[in-house]
């Protein structure tokens, strides 16, 4: 994992970074420290090496120094999907050293994502493979044709995890009004089964995405009662601060009991920032002690803004800034952007 901190390392270092605020969630450090780098890797933290013992010194006084940010939600299958960004624009150029593409590639197309996007990138790119075989080639309303039960192959999902270990690190599915109005929870149930067989976590989009069959529109207040009980501890739901009436919060002003229960059970909540963030909903959820476990930016091309009360920039650092503005301590936010996702990826 790029940006990794190791507890102790050899005394010979190539680079010393000195900072008056170094935040390392894995050790609990939040204060002045030296960072020692050898062969491009951080090997130790201390404050007692002479600066002349390294060939290079960076003075990071007045800056925040932390492990590389891990963005749990991006879309970077450029030229194959109609909403993919260049990987390094979503990654290192935006402050994230590791990014997780969420469902742009399916089991039949994931090889191209690795060969033509991940491998050439400076950024460490991983993916949650789409539950449908082709992936999310078309975003928004047009994409529904790809996400019906006939496009699901559990064996293909499992094989993609076996073929690309360490790159395919999870499965992406949907628990939203459009798909459920057409097929109920069948697609999500198949995704859960694939996740169980492949021993991978599931990441689930919430909030309306695909066209709704109005004759079968799910009741917004009870939609999450159909979705969340299907998930397992360690799975993740996205867009937890969305203002969509059929999102996590529902149409009311109180956090539903099923949401509280899911959070308490160990289901992870990801901010899924992008076009699905509302300060109003965020405040309500935070007042109920529902805080995001991870911070995904959901950066992708061609945004249409559906949020109700804020103009957003769609970046990992933008999401971090908003959470700090809502009162979360910076060290806590950094932990949710580094240590927590590293644990989900099994790379703590």
Where are these regions (language model features)?
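Metal-associated gating/positioning segment near the N- to mid-region
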Residues: 52, 59-120
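Divalent metal-coordination and catalytic microenvironments
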Residues: 20, 35, 40, 62, ...
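His/Asp/Glu-enriched, well-ordered alpha-helical/loop segment
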Residues: 282-348
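Alpha-helix-loop-beta-strand connector modules within alpha/beta enzyme cores
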Residues: 66, 116-128, 194-199, 262
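Histidine/acidic residue-rich metal-binding segments in metalloenzymes
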Residues: 112, 152-269, 276-293
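Histidine-rich, glycine-flanked metal-binding segment
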Residues: 5-66
């Amino acid at each position: 994992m790029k940006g990794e901190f190791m507890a102790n390392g050899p005394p010979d270092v190539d680079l010393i970074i000195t900072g008056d605020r170094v935040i390392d969630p894995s050790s609990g450090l939040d204060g002045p420290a030296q960072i020692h780098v050898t062969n491009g890797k951080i090997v130790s933290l201390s404050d007692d090496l002479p600066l002349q013992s390294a060939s290079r010194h960076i003075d990071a006084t007045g800056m925040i120094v932390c492990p590389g940010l891990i963005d749990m939600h991006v879309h970077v299958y450029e030229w194959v999907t109609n909403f993919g960004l260049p990987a390094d624009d979503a990654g290192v150029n935006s402050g994230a050293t590791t990014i997780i593409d969420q469902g742009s590639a399916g089991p039949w197309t994931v090889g191209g994502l690795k060969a033509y996007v991940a491998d050439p990138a400076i950024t460490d790119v991983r993916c949650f493979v789409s539950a449908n075989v082709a992936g999310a080639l078309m975003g928004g309303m047009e994409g529904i044709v790809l996400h019906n039960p006939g496009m699901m192959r559990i064996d293909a999902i499992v094989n993609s995890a076996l073929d690309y270990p360490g790159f395919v690190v999870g499965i992406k599915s949907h628990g939203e009004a459009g798909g459920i109005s057409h097929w109920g929870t069948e697609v999500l149930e198949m995704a859960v089964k694939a996740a169980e067989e492949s021993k991978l976590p599931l990441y689930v989009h919430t909030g309306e995405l695909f066209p709704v069959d109005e004759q079968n529109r799910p009741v917004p207040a009870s939609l999450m009662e159909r979705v969340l009980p299907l998930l397992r501890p360690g799975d993740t739901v996205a867009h937890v601060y969305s203002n969509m009436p059929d999102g996590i919060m529902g149409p009311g002003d109180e956090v539903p009991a099923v949401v509280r229960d899911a959070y308490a059970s160990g289901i992870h909540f990801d901010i899924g920032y992008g076009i699905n963030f509302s300060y109003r909903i965020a405040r309500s959820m935070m007042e109920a002690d529902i805080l995001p476990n991870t911070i995904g930016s959901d950066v992708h091309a061609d945004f249409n803004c559906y949020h109700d009360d804020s103009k957003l920039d769609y970046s990992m650092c933008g999401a971090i800034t908003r959470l700090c503005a809502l009162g979360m301590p910076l060290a806590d936010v950094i932990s949710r952007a580094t240590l927590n996702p590293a644990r989900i990826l099994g790379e703590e």
